[in-house]
Amino acid sequence: MNTLKVAGKFLDQPMLVAKFHNAVPTILTAGAAAYTTKEIAHAPQEKRKKAAIRIGTTMAFTVASALAAPKITNKLFKDADEIPKSIKELKKDATGLVEDFLKKNQVDEKSKQLLEKAKENILKYKEVKTLFKNFENNKNGKELLNKLIPDPENIDSKEIFSEIGRLSVFGLIPVLGGITGGIIGDKLTTDKWKKKIPDKIKEGSYQYLANIFLCNIGAGGALAIMEKLNIRSKGHRAIGMIGGIIATGVIGGSTIANLIGNKIINPLFEHGHKHKKEHLFDERKPEPLDIGLHTDDIATVAVMSGLKWIEPALPMMYSVSGYRAGIGYRNGKPHSDKN
């Protein structure tokens, strides 16, 4: 087994994925608190109280919605047997598999020690590599390892659009949460809060369309084509999905998002308002962080490729888009900074 496959197996250990999943709320909350503290400290002394309320409210709603997104999407899209198991359940399953295998098969002492460890603990990279190497010519051993650490499953044509929908709803929830928190934060700190709503919705649509939805469409569309052509290689499918993401999200995403903003969102908010010239017709241009946000598209490829380890990180990735929507970011300073 080559290095990449061993790395994939190591990262896809159910107990490792479950522990990472359980740690995400703490990691995301701590990161959000640190960023909020930094932003408040950088605000002018006389504006720090309002900045704390505005930024804190926006961040709180963003983080809360991002952490709620997995539960919501699981209820909407996943069957009961697909919902991740608890660590206790995983240990029970692993113990049963290992004990049943050892009763029926003779193995070397080193492999036995590692299997005993695998009942209730996460194996190290070298230990995973050792087990797969030792069981390379052992059919029953291979079957056991694939039960302990299941292989990624290619999504079939029937599941593609459901997965696009699930990931798109997953990404939408933090964006809506960020916008809601941003509006509440503005309402608590300024009488001009209504004037700031258009930029939040425009940035929300930009983040969602350019950095989330259209990228999912690109990846899913490419995957559907490869499924129709019966391309089963995970490497070729990954390359195809990345190509789809580049075409729809990275290249065309900002253009499409700005077009929708100018043709739909602007007319909706400009009617009867006095703030026609305040950024409403400015195009939102991609910045380095926007390009960086496309790292979550690698997560999209990984999830659609059946890898388990990346999914727990999605709330952290999508919360960046949610927060930017909440502050009504435009190129330059966020609109929320202006009073």
Where do the language-model regions lie?
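Glycine-rich, hydrophobic membrane-spanning regions of integral membrane proteins that mediate transport
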Residues: 1-339
